[in-house]
């Protein structure tokens, strides 16, 4: 028997079947770094229209987690897809480097500033620590395959950036948005500092819930208001609170002007409550025998005075819109120093903003004899005992409720009125302008707009001052007596910024006021406060984007972060940009959900359900992690587990196998001389290129809309359905058995080449390592990297006017599917082994029959059978299988006649008819020794 294997065009490629990504990717990264791939891309894209995705800086503390990976990979997919879309899209990664978490780490290792070393030395240690954290995170981000200017990132602790942050504050002051006030702010007693809204988390806490009676100063006046005289005992207005420790700061009782308030007689006294809450309050305090003596509107009680139960002064009843009937008594204990609503109404009524609590959370001396020096959370029991002793406590019980806590310490925080600096939301119209700007931004998903609108509409003034050591100084001088800002504040801030640009923030603390103020220095003091770190990151549109040369003065097109950043970076950036420039700092804002485990649970080390990106990269490779990110709908929670990553690895194998098939079958193909013109190609090959063209249109639309899971789904459909289960199966016969340089084979290779050129680019933003690997095996002259080019423009398709157009082949796909069902049944029944052992007869109605007949002898190649004939639908025998998909089709199967050709494996009756090649079929003889077979359709 002759060996005809050498006459076949068997697939061959050096592209490995196994990705072996965990081992192979680091080598690719080394090449990218050695070649300065990021620099090559920048040079290639120079002069193109820009797309700027501004990196929200992660905090320089700790290793990256799976959420960081999601964030950076999404950004990288966008930047790379924009590059392929013809944009110059520079990516400058950044880090947030100041603030409390770094201070705490340094304190743990070295102690607090002023103890073992100076504040200046402490700042130097903080800077050093942040730099090591940046280096660690940078290595992991690079390992993810994220391309960016990693050698020149922006750090909020860069001297120039620190200086520009000071300049941003100067601009805000110049525009009239800064004011000083003793407003209640979130205060962590462990941090001994104010906290931003975004630094507050909520946890369940058990607190005492108490009902307290404030006795009326003028009993007769109250009786007159209610038009009653027969009251037994004193009259009191009853408040309800879950923070007894705030009662020393009580300066009023708030009631609602439009609520009905009832005077209720109980045993030995009368109490005033909201009428709608009488029943629930009576149940709570255990009173069953009571009488409503009368009712009045809350407005009638305004400014009547009531005695504080133990502080020795009386307080007014005032009217407030914040009073509700959700719980309590309808009368709200009001302490302007301990709550934002209380503060606002206190300002309206001219109440004292009392703050009896020190920065460590203990009462200041002179507050009350049994409370001085006591921690506020330990004082609740003392206050309850005091109220009991004074006869003012109507009820006490334990209650679990959601309570604000410090994001760092996880401990309860307090509202505390302290002298702070604020960016005003309303004094110069910042709130109104911000709300206007929000409407001009595209929010992805679109619910983000309503979310941030609600936050901006309801947020208080922004407290931007902090009492910390490691932070950008506010760089202000205030008058010793008046506490007014120096009249030359903006000029002085610029002088400070120039010094900071050279020596960093330490320049402020080293500065002698006389250097800038001269003889005035004795009248002014340096403000010791630092800026909220959210001001640092929120001003990067100015301190970074406006000044980096690669951005060329363009504003950011996109901000992309997790959904918690509506109240964080998106908010602070919007506030600062609008306060500085009157406009939003971004055109698009995209948010992604949080990562959860396979059961939808939050990631937690204590549960043990965390997924480490480092582990995934070391086991499966970064491309698997990237494919998981891209294939998950980021608009909701993003589930990840070993099982989910295994599914991503399975999808990856399908894509890789498709790419490998294309490369292996392009062996020996030189596009410069072997390309077949479209009009000379086999029709099926043109259809396949048209499939790629349609897929590319869908994929590019999905990239443009940031619907990456749609990109992956379309890519998978193309690889699995259109290519894998149809086209690639059909062409194997022609590709392997036709003459090597025949039009039949070169047509097929031309199609594969066009498809591969498109496919490698579709993959590149997501499967960056694999795309780079594929790129290196593609035939023909090309740039060194796929990332410097653009989407492939060489695709074409069939015209609708052609007889064998897309609709024709779509119908053929269905016919092929129906034939496959019959073959599978025959294989199950042991009638045939493989499809080439079968011959099929297609009984079709006239319209379908005409289409099938048009393919002539090539119909069998489409169906992967050794024989295929078309007959009239009405002539079908009883055992012919009726198609469920095509009403006018029945399929009958028989065993193919003739012998099996050892070269092409088809069964034919002309095997051995040519004496010189007595073992193979006539078609193979032509391909081996003759002019070669001609293919027109398939």
Curated annotation (Swiss-Prot):
Q: Which InterPro entries match?
A: aa-tRNA-synth_I_CS, aa-tRNA-synth_Ia, Anticodon_Ile_BEm, Ile-tRNA-ligase, Ile-tRNA-ligase_type1, Ile-tRNA_ligase, M/V/L/I-tRNA-synth_anticd-bd, Rossmann-like_a/b/a_fold
Where are the N6-acetyllysine modifications?
Answer: 183
Residues bound to ATP are 605
Major location, coarse class? cytoplasm
What reaction does this catalyse? Answer: tRNA(Ile) + L-isoleucine + ATP = L-isoleucyl-tRNA(Ile) + AMP + diphosphate
The subcellular location is: Cytoplasm
Cofactor section: Zn(2+)
Query: What does the protein in this record do?
Result: Catalyzes the attachment of isoleucine to tRNA(Ile). As IleRS can inadvertently accommodate and process structurally similar amino acids such as valine, to avoid such errors it has two additional distinct tRNA(Ile)-dependent editing activities. One activity is designated as 'pretransfer' editing and involves the hydrolysis of activated Val-AMP. The other activity is designated 'posttransfer' editing and involves deacylation of mischarged Val-tRNA(Ile).
Q: Which family does it belong to?
A: Belongs to the class-I aminoacyl-tRNA synthetase family. IleS type 1 subfamily.
Name-wise, this protein is Isoleucine--tRNA ligase
* Species whose genome carries this gene: Escherichia coli O17:K52:H18 (strain UMN026 / ExPEC)
What is this organism's lineage?
Bacteria, Pseudomonadati, Pseudomonadota, Gammaproteobacteria, Enterobacterales
